[in-house]
Every structure is written in C-alpha cells, then in structure tokens.
C-alpha cells in the first residue's frame, strides 16, 4: 500500500512502533484498537491505490480467494463478474477518460446520476484516482433538481443514464460551468460522450494522485427535509475510517463474504455500503439491478445466490415478510442490517422466527455516514439505533452543546473538538453559515432528537423541528407513525404539529390509506385509528386531527417532508 511504503516506522497505535507490514496486519486484524483521529492517521491516503490496488496485488500474488470483487446481475439473465485486477484496469481507463478526454482535474466537481449499473462503480473509483469530487444523485431527480445541483456545485461534468438525458438537456443552457456530458447508454446522443466506448479505447495505465487525508473526495446532498439540499463535503477520511479496527466491527466482513447492499446509488449509504466497507475488507459486492423493488425477486435472489450479508431499508424486510412463501430460511445468509427508520417490534420478531436471523439497526446522515449501530456482538434492543461507532464520540446534547444525562431528550451530537473525527463531513460547500449553525460548542449538532440510556443505547425520536409539544407532552412523530402503521388501513403516514386554540399544538396525522379501505366511512375510520393509537401507545400521543391524502410530500431520497406539512398547518405556505 503506497502510503505504508512511505513510512519506515509508523507510531499510530498507542504504545506500538510498527513497520508498514505490521501496521497493515494490525489495521486488518486488531479488534480492541484505541480511537483514531486526524492526528494519528496517515498524511496521504487514496482508496483507489491503497485499497482496490492492494487487493489487486493480493490476487496477483495468489493471496486472495477466487471470489469476484464485483458481482452484478439483472432480471434479464445478464451477469458481470469482475476481479480486483479487472476493476483496477477499468477504473484506470476511466481516470484517463476524465483527464485526457474530458480535461477534468483534481478538485473539479462531477455529478454522478446513475442507477445500479456497473459504470457507477467505475466512475466513483475513477474520480478517486484523479481527485475529482464526485456527487452522487438518485435517478429520481427531475430537471429542476438537476439544475439546482449543477448550478450550486458549479459541476464541470455529469455522468448519467439515457433516461435522464432529456432532463439534463432541458437545463444545460442554464449551467455555464457544465462542459462535459457523458452518458451510459446503448445508443448515441447528440452532444454527449459515450462513456462505455471511451473506456474501451482508453489506456489502462494511470498514475493515481497522492491525495492528502484532508483533500475533498465526495459531496453528498442532504435530503432537504428542512429546506433546499445542502452539499455535505467529505474528505478521504470517509474512506479511511473503514480501516479503523473498531469501525470494522460494524459488519465484520471477511474476504469470503458476499454483501448485498440495496441502497440507491444516490445515497451516502451506497458509497459506504456498496463500495468502501466491502472492498476495504476485500470481499464481494453483490448487486441486483432492480429498477423497482420486487419482494418476490428479493426472495428468489437470496435463495439463488450465496449472499452472506444483506443491508437494506426497513421496507425491504417488511415486503419480504408479506410474501406468502412458507420458507424464508435463506441457505447462506448470516447477517442482516437496516437503517433509515425502525421496523415494528413484531416485524423484528417475525423476521427472526421465519429466517432465524436478527436485524441489526444502523443510523447515519449525509454528514456522517454510519455513526451508530447495533454491532453483531451487541445485545439488540428493539427500536434502538444502537451505540456510537468509533471514532465518533456521540452524546445527547442541549442547544448549547452541554451533555445531557441518560434518558433525557436532546440532540444527537458528535464531538468535533479538540479534533474533528474521521468520517465526519468537512463543511457544507459554499455555505459557511449553514456549517456554523450546526457547530454547537464542542459538538456537531445533527438536528436529530434522541435519548441515550444507561447502557449507551440511543433511542431516535425524530428531527428536532419534527418533535411535537402538545399540552406539555413532547411527542416524537416516529412513535405515532409506527403505531398507525400497525393498523391494516394505513399504507403510510406523516405526523406533524398542528395549531389548536385550546392546547397550542396537537398531533395531526396525514394518512395514505390502503386501497381496500378507500371506500370506508372516513369519520368512522378516523375514530377507529385514534382508538387504535391509544391502545398501542401512550394515549396522549394519539392524533387529534386526521387527514386522508393520496400521497405524502417526499424528498428525492424518499424521506417525508414533514416541514412542508407542518408549515401548511401553520399557514406558512
């Protein structure tokens, strides 16, 4: 590994003086490692050369098994298997395309909007090799979303799929910085470069840049639940963090593992869970190109392929449980992880009963990556997002950054002083005011409300501005939404605060009904739902107001925009 070779003696673990070889071995095997931060990390690091190329070398030396590094399938019978050596070749070609054909250089911004196709991985690592800052986005983006992202970031290039070419073309004239447009497509498009053709003719010889640990690597747009999406800029520490032995306990991946992470490529979880985490461990990334999630296909895939770990949104597990198949004992699956929201307690139990496996919950943001989790060896507390993952010192704080005692509601904070931890975003690009707003004393204030118990388990309540103060009671919307989700009439719901002349605020639920309940008497159904909530949770949490809607406002990443609903209630729209 390049940066290791430049150090004859590295003193990075307290009490140890390590040669490069010893350090590498300790990085990949030590379990009880102390905290790492910017002071004891290497000065230079690049995921492409120090991780992917390392495993390519291990393959050449016969020190890694025959399993592919990348295994991609779709529903039409197509299959791709790439070794780390093949990935090295293809990503070097990609880097040459960016530098020699597109004229891009270190520090330039590239918008990456692709579905789950192999080229997404090539572009991402190609950007790492060149120092180009990649900015992933979901293919659900519309023209106005793309315009906003390109303009605010001053992106010089975009790589996207054929279906989004018209969307980009409709706004390209308003993006003076956008010089290069590359498309992943089977057909040519006027004014666009054919990405696949270019990498076929490009040279596989490329010298990776020597990036500093603090050099920018990626920008992830926030979900926009509280306004326009902000640009959370991350440096190389986001990738290096996966080296930290304590961080490697998250999934405990081995080179023999096959990980299926179902995250949308536009989210930070895809960069971490579909690329950084598995390839740091030298294991296989498995991808099924699902344009839309089909629970039947998911079940079939888990039976057909030797997948050992699964990382998916709660809705995926919920949909699988709804399948009528009697057998969900997947032959090779060993570990399941979820995040984004909580499953109901009975859903956790059903999954355990039907698969024999527990579901471990993780929590994170665009700014943090995964910051807390229920690790494999930890006791599972249903509804908890687990404990903080090193190097994050996660505490519950008040508005001034004071640490609150256990079981006291506050904000999830991550300590940033005296040292900003690896993996935490650098800043909100082009928005120093927004960056300052989330710095709270010695902590980064996530804006998410939670409590922490005596054992260090964190209990998520919701966004800070989502918490409802009704008649002196503070109510987290997630609690009420989970209660409503247990009723068969409710397809999905969003709970917000609504003004009330007598109580100041009351709980209001916006509910999308399942089709079979659309013809029911609405007044009677409201009473039934209110009674149901009272029966399954504290009665003061029940929604005094209920409105049935056909759909809920959501961000492009699928998060409910409660702020929009709340503003409507208080007449701010």
Swiss-Prot record:
Binding site for ATP: 222-230, 448, 463, 559
Annotated InterPro entries: AMP-bd_C, AMP-bd_C_sf, AMP-binding_CS, AMP-dep_synth/lig_dom, ANL_N_sf, Mitochondrial_ACSM
Transit peptide feature, positions: 1-35
Catalytic activity: a medium-chain fatty acid + ATP + CoA = a medium-chain fatty acyl-CoA + AMP + diphosphate; benzoate + ATP + CoA = benzoyl-CoA + AMP + diphosphate; (R)-lipoate + GTP + H(+) = (R)-lipoyl-GMP + diphosphate; octanoate + ATP + CoA = octanoyl-CoA + AMP + diphosphate
UniProt cofactor(s): Mg(2+); Mn(2+)
Keyword presence, Iron: no
Protein purpose: Catalyzes the activation of fatty acids by CoA to produce an acyl-CoA, the first step in fatty acid metabolism. Capable of activating medium-chain fatty acids (e.g. butyric (C4) to decanoic (C10) acids), and certain carboxylate-containing xenobiotics, e.g. benzoate. Also catalyzes the activation of lipoate to lipoyl-nucleoside monophosphate. Activates lipoate with GTP at a 1000-fold higher rate than with ATP and activates both (R)- and (S)-lipoate to the respective lipoyl-GMP, with a preference for (R)-lipoate.
Subunit structure: Monomer.
Protein name: Acyl-coenzyme A synthetase ACSM1, mitochondrial
Organism: Mus musculus
């Amino acid at each position: 590994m390049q940066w290791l070779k430049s150090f004859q003696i590295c003193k990075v673990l307290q009490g140890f003086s390590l040669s490069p070889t010893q350090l590498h071995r300790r990085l990949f095997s030590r379990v009880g490692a102390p905290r790492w931060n910017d002071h004891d990390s290497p000065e230079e690091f690049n995921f492409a050369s120090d991780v992917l190329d390392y495993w390519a070398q291990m393959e050449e030396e016969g020190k890694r098994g025959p399993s592919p590094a990348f295994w991609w399938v779709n529903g039409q019978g197509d299959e791709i298997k790439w070794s780390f050596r093949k990935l090295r070749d293809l990503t070097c070609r990609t880097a040459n395309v960016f530098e020699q054909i597109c004229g891009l250089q270190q520090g330039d911004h590239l918008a990456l909007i692709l579905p789950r196709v192999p080229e997404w991985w090539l572009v991402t690592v190609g950007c790492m090799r060149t120092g180009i800052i990649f900015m992933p986005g979901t293919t659900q983006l519309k023209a106005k979303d793309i315009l906003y992202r390109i303009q605010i970031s001053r992106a010089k290039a975009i790589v996207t799929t054929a279906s989004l070419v018209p969307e980009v073309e409709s706004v390209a004239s308003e993006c003076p910085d956008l010089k290069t447009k590359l498309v992943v497509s089977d057909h040519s498009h006027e004014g666009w470069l054919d990405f696949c053709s270019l990498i076929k003719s490009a040279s596989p010889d490329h010298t990776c840049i020597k990036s500093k640990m603090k050099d920018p690597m990626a920008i992830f747009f926030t979900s926009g639940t509280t306004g326009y999406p902000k640009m959370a800029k991350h440096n190389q520490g986001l990738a290096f963090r996966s080296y930290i032995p304590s961080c490697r306990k998250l999934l405990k991946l081995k080179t023999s593992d096959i990980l299926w992470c179902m995250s949308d490529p536009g989210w930070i979880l895809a960069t971490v869970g579909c690329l950084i985490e598995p390839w740091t461990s030298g294991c296989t990334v498995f991808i099924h190109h699902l344009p839309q999630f089909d629970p039947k296909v998911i079940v079939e895939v888990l039976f057909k392929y030797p997948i050992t770990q699964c990382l998916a949104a709660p809705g995926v597990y919920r949909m699988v449980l709804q399948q009528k198949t009697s057998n969900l004992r997947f032959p090779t699956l060993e570990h399941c992880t979820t995040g984004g929201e909580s499953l109901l307690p009975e859903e956790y139990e059903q999954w355990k009963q039907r698969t024999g496996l527990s579901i471990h919950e993780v929590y994170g943001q665009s700014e943090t990556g995964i910051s807390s989790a229920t690790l494999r060896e930890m006791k599972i507390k249903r509804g908890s997002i687990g404990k903080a993952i090193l190097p994050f010192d996660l505490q519950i704080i008040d508005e001034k950054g004071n640490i609150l005692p256990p079981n006291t509601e506050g904000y999830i904070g991550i300590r940033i002083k005296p040292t900003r931890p690896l993996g935490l975003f650098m800043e909100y690009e082009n928005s120093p005011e927004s960056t300052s707003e989330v710095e709270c004393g010695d902590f980064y204030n996530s804006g998410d409300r939670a409590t922490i118990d005596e054992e260090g388990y964190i209990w998520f309540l919701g966004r800070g501005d989502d918490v409802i103060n009704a008649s002196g009671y503070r109510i987290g919307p997630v609690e009420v939404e989970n209660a409503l989700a247990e009723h068969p009439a409710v397809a999905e719901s969003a709970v917000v605060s609504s003004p009330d002349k007598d109580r100041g605020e009351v709980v209001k639920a916006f509910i999308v009904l399942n089709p079979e309940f659309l013809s029911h008497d609405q007044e009677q159904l409201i009473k039934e739902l209110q009674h149901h909530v009272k029966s399954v949770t504290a009665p003061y949490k029940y929604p005094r107001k209920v409105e049935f809607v056909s759909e809920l406002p959501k961000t492009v990443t699928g998060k409910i925009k409660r702020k929009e609903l709340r503003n409507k209630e208080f007449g701010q729209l």
